[in-house]
């Protein structure tokens, strides 16, 4: 889904891309934007994910809206919302430059309402796209992972056994965890 969303956003060389959310989708979006030749800013509250974002290609990694505005006062050419939180979806168009683009990749609970100010988007001619799964990008995504174009290794923060999975699912993730994977018979 990240690749499809980034295709929709169409980041270009020299553009500025703000990625909101430091989970797996956001960190993959950072790599894809960097591959396009964009300047990339990652917005996530987690200091561990900020560091990881910088290590995988983000030019900047910050924790607040005001930090973003300090770096890019006019806003970003492309804002990619990956957190799936009502507040960040509402914020996304406000951090785009006039004439900019927004892609919502984060999944919000079905039925949840998100306040957006249409006049601001109209006045500043912000394009907003929503992206979900697209089976036509799976082969290309797998190839990018297989050939190392996209590095997923740093996104796996913990490997757990099948026996540990129940406790891991029931417990809050450790600070900075991006993704735990289950490997049967893993000691």
PLM region descriptions:
Residues 43-47, 82, 132:
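N-terminal Rossmann-fold cofactor-binding loop
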Residues 9, 51-126:
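Glycine-rich cofactor phosphate-binding loops and adjacent beta1-alpha1 units
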Residues 105-109, 131-133, 156:
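Short strand-turn motif at the edge of the Rossmann-like AdoMet-binding core
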Residues 1-66:
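Mid-domain Rossmann-like dinucleotide-binding core that forms the NAD(H)/NADP(H) cofactor-binding site
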């Amino acid at each position: 889904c990240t690749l499809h969303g980034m295709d929709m956003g169409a980041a270009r060389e020299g553009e500025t891309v703000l990625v909101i959310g430091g989970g797996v989708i956001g960190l993959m979006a950072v790599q894809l934007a960097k591959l396009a030749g964009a300047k990339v800013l990652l917005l996530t509250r987690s200091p561990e994910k900020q560091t990881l974002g910088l290590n995988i290609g983000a030019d900047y990694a910050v924790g607040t809206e005001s930090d973003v505005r300090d770096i890019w006062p006019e806003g970003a050419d492309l804002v990619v919302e990956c957190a799936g939180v009502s507040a960040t979806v509402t914020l996304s168009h406000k951090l785009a430059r006039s004439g900019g683009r927004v892609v919502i990749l984060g999944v919000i609970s079905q039925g949840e309402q998100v306040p957006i100010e249409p006049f601001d988007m109209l006045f500043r001619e912000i394009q907003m796209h929503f992206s979900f799964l697209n089976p036509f990008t799976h082969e290309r995504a797998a190839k990018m992972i297989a050939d190392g174009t996209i590095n997923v290794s740093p996104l796996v923060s913990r490997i757990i056994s099948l026996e540990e999975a129940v406790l891991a699912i029931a417990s809050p993730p450790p600070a900075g965890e991006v993704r735990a994977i289950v490997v049967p018979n893993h000691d």
